[in-house]
Design a protein with these regions (language model features):
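C-terminal structural segments of small proteins and small subunits
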Residues: 69-87
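Short S/T/G/P-rich N-terminal loop/turn motif that feeds into the first structured element of a domain
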Residues: 1-70, 95-97
Length: 97
């Protein structure tokens, strides 16, 4: 089975305190589902001037497979609701090759 990668791109952090609390609570849930953080941070640069404005924060996590990633985020639903309105974010899962 192919690994899965969850990518979260935070275009805007509206409420840093909500994000801080979300991250503290979510780390335990994600870890319990085998998540491995590959990249977390806000030190983001464009590759070229044509790429637009870089996000304020980005996260990449590795899971054993897509199903494990989906289960982790289903288990984390209560934390997701606490983050509501705290960030503008796009999050998706990509199956590895």
């Amino acid at each position: 089975m192919a690994k899965a990668y969850v990518v979260a791109v935070y275009s805007k952090i509206i409420d840093p305190e909500k994000l801080k609390n979300y991250l503290q609570d979510s780390r335990c849930v994600m870890g319990a589902h085998g998540a491995k953080a590959l990249a977390i941070g806000s030190n983001i640069s464009n590759i070229s001037k044509l790429e637009g404005i870089p996000p304020e924060r980005a996260v990449i996590m590795e899971f054993e497979d897509v199903e494990a990633a989906q289960k982790a985020f289903q288990s984390n639903q209560a934390n997701e609701e606490k983050l509501e309105g705290g960030v503008d974010r796009v999050m998706f899962v990509v199956e590895g090759v």
